[in-house]
Curated annotation (Swiss-Prot):
It comes from Schizosaccharomyces pombe (strain 972 / ATCC 24843). This is Stress response protein bis1. It holds the Pfam family Es2. InterPro entries: Nuclear_protein_DGCR14_ESS-2. Has a role in maintaining cell viability during stationary phase induced by stress response. May be involved in pre-mRNA splicing. Its main location: nucleus. Residues 1-22, 344-384 are annotated as: Disordered. It comes from the Eukaryota. One of its GO terms (biological process) is mRNA cis splicing, via spliceosome. Belongs to the ESS2 family. The lineage of its organism: Eukaryota, Fungi, Dikarya, Ascomycota, Taphrinomycotina. One of its GO terms (cellular component) is nucleus.
């Protein structure tokens, strides 16, 4: 786009020159077979000019060899490629009838210049390409509307445009005005459509993120009973209390009361508590007392038996007195004395032998070192 300067008497203006030749025209849609046939003909004439001659030579060689199959297959091709140049080509005659543009007709007739592939595609197109182009235009239009709706950009009133001075025509201002770049920091404003994708932490949280945040927060009011419920539960009951009756009993099955009986169904209200721990039977209480007595007595007798055993070992008593003392001990003390004293290999079978052994073992053994012998020195001479 070029801008031309137009000088007037009063003011100077920048006017965009109007070029009428640069008008865009949509290509003419053709049927798919016709479009492909014309395109193949142009490619063959431009890039493979000797291809018809080569095919004709192959057909002639097949006739000389006698390959009738190749003759039957190339029968239609011989009619195309063995025709003289000045004769009418059926393909060249068919293409101009499909075209509408006058310049394209003249180029296809071959009077001035051969038509190129680019010019052919600019003038003509297939029906499939045309329908696809319409779909792309609709998509771009929807994207532009979405862009305007999302970012607040309106083509009629551009907010970020340079204020020019000296322009009288508003159309000229719109044609050369451009949008200023945003000076703020670029942030990621993309919002995913799929809830499983990562949700960006932008300045403005989406409704989905707010709902998730509310569901994960723990509120103190929701963790217990409300105050109104507690007050209602603590209020005294206004229901009439049925007076207890001595002759009436609560409903029970095999001695077990029906706990789930509603108020009013039972014949009376009992003051008994069905959730107490029952008292231990007398048999179990006597057994526990007996066990405690035996444990305390066994502890005392063990201490006394150990003392008596030690005195018996250290005393000068006869075997009969020792046996009498052993009979007064408990079985555990007797086993201890028998294991440590009577059946020990270090002691004899009689108390006298044990006494001598005890005396022997009680005497401490002292280790001594012999003093080395010192040679006698000469006597000190007497002083006169």
């Amino acid at each position: 786009m070029s801008l031309a300067k137009k000088i007037d008497d009063d003011e100077k203006q920048l006017v965009k020159p109007v070029n009428k030749e640069q008008t865009y025209k949509k290509p003419i849609p053709l049927e798919e077979d016709d479009y492909i046939e014309g395109l193949s003909y142009i490619i063959q004439q431009q890039y493979f000019p000797d291809l018809p001659k080569l095919k004709a030579e192959v057909v002639l060689e097949s006739e000389e060899v006698g390959s009738f199959d190749a003759q039957n297959e190339s029968r239609d091709e011989k009619l195309k490629y063995l025709i003289a140049k000045n004769s009418e080509d059926p393909l060249r005659k068919r293409l101009p009838s499909l075209a509408i543009h006058e310049i394209t007709k003249a180029q296809l007739d071959g009077e001035n210049k051969p038509i190129s592939v680019a010019s052919y595609q600019n003038k003509f197109t297939s029906e499939d390409n045309a329908s696809f182009g319409e779909l792309m235009e609709d998509e771009s239009r929807l994207r532009a509307e979405q862009h305007k709706r999302r970012f607040g950009v309106h083509s009629q009133q551009p907010s970020n445009s340079i204020q020019t001075i000296g322009y009288s025509n508003s159309d000229a201002i719109k044609s050369i005005a451009w949008k200023e770049k945003d000076k703020s920091i670029k942030t990621w404003n993309y919002q995913p459509k799929n809830a499983l994708m990562y949700t960006p932490e932008t300045n403005h949280s989406s409704s989905l993120s707010q709902i998730k945040k509310q569901s994960t927060e723990i509120q103190a009011d929701a963790t217990g009973l409300s105050q109104s419920f507690l007050e209602a539960a603590n209020q005294p009951s206004t229901d009439p209390i049925v007076p207890p009756s001595v002759n009436e009993t609560d409903a029970s099955v095999n001695g077990y009361p029906l706990v789930d009986v509603n108020f009013g169904q039972a014949v009376g209200s009992s003051s008994k508590s069905y959730f107490n721990i029952p008292e231990r039977p007398r048999r179990e209480r006597l057994h526990a007392m007996r066990v405690r007595d035996i444990r305390s007595h066994s502890t005392n007798t063990t201490i006394t038996s150990v003392d008596s055993a030690s005195t018996a070992l250290n005393s000068y008593s006869t075997p009969n007195s020792v046996s009498r003392k052993l009979t007064n001990l408990t079985p555990a003390a007797r086993r201890l004395v028998a294991r440590s004293y009577l059946r020990s290999p270090l002691h004899g079978s009689s108390p006298s032998a044990s006494r001598h052994t005890a005396l022997r073992t009680s005497i401490p053994k002292f280790s001594w070192t012999p003093t080395p012998r010192v040679k006698s020195t000469a006597p000190t001479p007497k002083r006169v």
